[in-house]
Amino acid sequence: MKRLFSLLLLLAPLSTALAQQFVEDSLKVDGYVRRFGLFLPDGIKADAPLVFYLHGYGGRIQRDNPMIETASREGFAVCIPQGLKDPKGKPSWNVGYPFQEGWKVDDVKSLSKMAAYVQKHYHLSRENTFLTGMSNGGEMCYLMAYSKQKTFKAVAPIAGLTMVWMYRDLEACKPIPLFEIHGTEDRTSEWTGDLDNKGGWGAYMPVPLAVGYWVAKNRCMKEETERVEGLNKDNGHYIIQHRFTNSATGCDVWLYEVVGGKHSTHTEDIKTGDEIWSFFKKHMGK
């Protein structure tokens, strides 16, 4: 299937119908078959940027995730991996939840290997590869940022959290651009954190403190704050956009505080895919 698709991609100018594709592929890492979907928009060019989108806890390969529409307009590829089943039988990313203890799946390694595979076999950019994800996928973004990986140039967790164990046991080896989007009324991934593990997901940090770690790590010396009304005028939500910048390193940190927002991708409040792509594009290599 993959080889056939590659041939069709080369013949794309002959047929628009063949140019825009959603294909499924897989590779084996540490004995596990790792599946993924890949969206390649109409007219995509060789060495185009690549964005990974990670589903939430219990999720599946999501063809209608917030990045697809943006990718169709902007010409980048979107890879949507499938998490493996954890000890509770739920597809997920191994971020060290208490009930994942003893689970040997290394998703930092698996996603890095997958990115290298996709870059090579689908002729996509090695330099401009980025990572975003929702909830459990957002936690995976933070874990990747803390890890000694060189694959993902920037990360954008949505409703993501920094587990206390990450902050305690890991030391980020280098600055990395980070963009968090989070609702203040999120009762699944609490804005105020859960240091006592009352929710059963493990202890995790308050969102402003978790983001503040990266502000300090990236040595962002300037903050710009702007209040923006949400797209849905009926729900009363508004967004406080915190942008922390470092002109020397270029490793910015953004936090979109969705006031009144709950546990979601916030597509009713902002153009989530466009905002994330705007952040990633700002950090692309030439």
Please state what every model-predicted region is.
Residues E180-H182:
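Short beta-strand/loop motif that positions the catalytic acidic residue
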Residues K109-E127:
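Conserved acidic catalytic loop of the alpha/beta-hydrolase fold
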Residues C173-L178, T249-V253:
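Short, proline-enriched alpha-helix->beta-strand connector loops that line the catalytic pocket
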Residues A17-L50, G59, T70-R73, F99, ...:
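A domain-start/cap signature at the N-terminus of enzymes
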Residues T184-T225:
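Accessory cap/linker subdomain of secreted extracellular hydrolases
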Residues G83-D106:
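Cap/lid segment of the alpha/beta-hydrolase catalytic domain
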Residues L4-L14:
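Sec-dependent N-terminal signal peptides
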Residues I44-G89, F152, V164-W165, T188-E190, ...:
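Short substrate-entry loop that stabilizes the transition state in hydrolases
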